[in-house]
Amino acid sequence: MTSRALTFLPFDTVWKMRIDHPYSLLVKEGDLLWSCGQCPLSGAGEVLHSDELLPQAKEVIGFIERFLGEIDCKTTAVTRLTVYYVKTNDGDAAALDRLFQERFGPQVLITPITTPHFYYEGMLIEVDVFGSTRQKRHCVYVDEATGVELSVVETDALAWANLRVIHLPEDENPFPEVLERLMRRAGLSRDGLLAEQWFAGDERVGKSLTSMAWSPALESCGVLSIEHDGTDLLAEMTFLKNASVSRMSAGAALCLPEGLEIRLAKAENLFHVTACDNSGARGIVEQTRRIMHALERTLTDSGLAFHNVRKTTTHYVSGNSAEGLHENMAVRNDYYSRPGPASTGLPVKGFPNSNALISVTLTGTVHG
């Protein structure tokens, strides 16, 4: 990033959640931007078009366009939209993909991710926005033998990559080789991998990833179980183009309590942290407390702090009540002050390769 100008779009100027919090609707630093989860809510926090997926999606699209304009950005700045939704019919993923591409263009990565439910009754969709104001290039790379697809949007500094596997072969051993071939064609390397999140469309797929030995994330909370909607496996990855990423596992390095797993990836300007409690011995609120305390220690040990965070994402296993979100959210909120980062927190089906009930990821800037 050549410019370090930092902009926060306040949350409460638009609509209110049913819990006080320090987060921002959008955060822009230099050429990069991140959003909180964009929801189909009224100014009073009531669900719009209750239980209607596509009308809610259209409302969210309108919000995204409006909020980007409020920080002097165009929709051409968008690189990736992570579309969390409750599946109502087979083919919802394809319908959402078409709708968002019609409005944002084919050069934007769309990741449709099913969630079992949301925290407000009648709400069916929430969308994360990632972007850059730099000039971008979009390419799709397909492995002809397997149909595995890698879609990439890149600037001269960063690449956002979406992996899509419609049918994962029963023999999963060749899959890492397929992925490496596609990455080489795209000019990407694991040395530059800053962030990754995997989404498995069934239990077999999720558990099979542990044997691939491609990334430590596949053996833990880096894999989420989602309901199948046309795709066996999805992954979101972010790469640095011209820099290597240093990695550390903070558990042993900082003598963290047993069961806590913290993985930190850090480069010259950006960092990404993933945290979870694999012990399986505690409830979601206590896991959240342990995670946030460990994250604070990890950031401090790395010369960082929570004010460096620009985007935080929380996935958790819970019921479909607001309390399920608000209880763990209240713990996380205490670590930030206004104006805080963009934030998303929502339920998931599960973590097939971990005993965790919740995972927390942080993305931020080293010099923030």
Residue ranges of predicted features:
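N-terminal presequence-like segments and the immediate start of the first folded domain
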Residues: M1-G62, R66-T79, Y85-R310, Y316-G368
